[in-house]
Amino acid sequence: MNINDLKLTLSKAGQEHLLRFWNELEEAQQVELYAELQAMNFEELNFFFQKAIEGFNQSSHQKNVDARMEPVPREVLGSATRDQDQLQAWESEGLFQISQNKVAVLLLAGGQGTRLGVAYPKGMYDVGLPSRKTLFQIQAERILKLQQVAEKYYGNKCIIPWYIMTSGRTMESTKEFFTKHKYFGLKKENVIFFQQGMLPAMSFDGKIILEEKNKVSMAPDGNGGLYRALAAQNIVEDMEQRGIWSIHVYCVDNILVKVADPRFIGFCIQKGADCGAKVVEKTNPTEPVGVVCRVDGVYQVVEYSEISLATAQKRSSDGRLLFNAGNIANHFFTVPFLRDVVNVYEPQLQHHVAQKKIPYVDTQGQLIKPDKPNGIKMEKFVFDIFQFAKKFVVYEVLREDEFSPLKNADSQNGKDNPTTARHALMSLHHCWVLNAGGHFIDENGSRLPAIPRSATNGKSETITADVNHNLKDANDVPIQCEISPLISYAGEGLESYVADKEFHAPLIIDENGVHELVKNGI
């Protein structure tokens, strides 16, 4: 260890306080801190901080974003409800791309389940389905099934590679989990793990914060750290070598995610897009979700906190909210576009500033847990690159079919928790059974009514999930039903299992057959 060189480097960068407790540390602690500091580029970090603060101050003083916002124009919008005559063509195109081994999925899985009350990665969480499957297993099985669907459709054996971005905190436990479960039936060589970067937390005056005498306070660099990680770990090269063209990017916490959704892929391909966003219709003006729109003619996501209530409440002539394209972190990119992002555009992206309450050691070495923000964490967002797309498109889907995020613990009595996620999936699977000709009966043998949901265009539609059930207690859900992804990717192929048959709930349909569960066991 050349401590004098390190001291000089830190002094030049104005970060010499990081060695304040050096002489108090044991040798092993010194080695640990030395290695951590040696790995940092302080000149770059100071530049990041300066640009992030400039951007933060500029946006704080910038004139209201409202006047510069335009909604997504209809010509770049595809809709699962309003373009039903084109859905089959988009699906066929997407399945063709999959059959040609040109589609991969990229999972953003850096988050721990801290808000869920667990210390392991979110993807390992079990929301309490009858099968006890975790989010990782559900998504892996959807990939397996979709490969089979594409193969059956076009006759070609195919592979959908799965790229999984973890963080420093989740990498090892995620890899161990996949190894333990034999990659859920996927081939190990087609599941590629890589790690997003970390950045130190900094005080408002640009000083790196120590969380212990020998440890810097570090945090992941946001889901937009994806692009730097793609470059650093040669992931784009791997995609190019495999002949991949289309990438579907999504977050781990959405239990309803249609991994490598052929309709979404096909829509983007047929539109000639290099970048696309899947959205759900925002129906409540105050719903805390960002909206995809144009600002000064450039596509981006505007966070709900940046939009005035008056603008959020604006409606178009058909009664829908004017700014209704709710962002769900579900995106399409072409590999050539990602190559351009990695080589050209990523360095142009500014970090966003998140003011945080960051525990730190004071000059006496005492751990302080502040009760108000005392510093910043810097992060980039995955959607920051929309602005660079040559052809950007938006695909709108039904929330009850495709979006139920897992953010909070049940104990927080809100939404987006294990109960709402579980109910959303079971409500959807209930609908699949009804649409395939199955029926549910109560304890007296009477058929339970199935009420089709009216489509927005006024025509009768297939039965869709009732999102009102998603917030109720598990015991209040009228129908508990789970269908393994290995049996059906999106409700297809269920007729042979359920048509003209009657079932008691809870019902499970999996590779071992059809099971009606009772309260005290099977």
Swiss-Prot record:
One Gene Ontology CC term in the entry: cytosol
Main enzyme class: transferase
EC number of the protein: 2.7.4.-, 2.7.7.83, 2.7.7.23
Residues reported in the UniProt entry to bind UDP-N-acetyl-alpha-D-glucosamine 1: 108, 110-111, 196, 222-223, 251-252, 290, 303-304, 327, 381, 407
Name of the protein in its database record: UDP-N-acetylhexosamine pyrophosphorylase
Transferase as UniProt keyword: yes
Lineage of the organism: Eukaryota, Metazoa, Chordata, Craniata, Vertebrata
Compartment(s) of residence: Cytoplasm, Cytosol
MF GO annotations: identical protein binding; protein serine pyrophosphorylase activity; UDP-N-acetylgalactosamine diphosphorylase activity; UDP-N-acetylglucosamine diphosphorylase activity
Keyword Electron transport recorded: no
Gene: UAP1
UniProt keyword list: Cytoplasm, Immunity, Innate immunity, Nucleotidyltransferase, Transferase
Annotated source species: Homo sapiens
